[in-house]
Amino acid sequence: MKNKIIFGVLVSVGALALLSSCSSIPKNAKPVANFDVNRYLGTWYEIARFDYRFEKDLDNAIAQYSLNADGNVDVLNSGYNFKKEKWVSAKGLAKFRGDKKTAALKVSFFGPFYAGYNVIALDEDYRYALVAGKNLDYLWILSREKSIPEDIKNKYLKIAQEVGYNTSKLIWVKQDKNSPFENEK
């Protein structure tokens, strides 16, 4: 009986941790309002990111988003592993955490496990985006082109710093190859 109670408590704590991890956003960050997912779809080049094990040793990283029949967003991430000298890709699924006009989503590449994906800055033409994860360990700067203007870069770095990110830890992603996965969905 005691083991069943302990097991029940552990399952409950695990479920709470999982739920909170997929719905959180850094304290000082706010997802973009009046978000239009249709304008966000398509190819985004990764300009900068923190060092994550899922993207370790990747250059030329891109993310491609397309709307599926359920109204959720199919994700195809790809990049060139410069140590293994080969292209890699991962397919995922993004879902809105609430109102579809708010850029607060959760994304999964591993079955039922989701992580926060929050667009916290976006230019009016949907060319540049600043994306926060669930906490201050996850941050991306994205662009529709392989580079980003210096003024946009500085603006997004300032926003990230105001949220609490240590932007000195950003990795600036090399974009010098064309992905064989580009425009593949």
Descriptions of predicted regions:
Residues 2-185:
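A beta-rich soluble binding module of mature secreted/lumenal proteins
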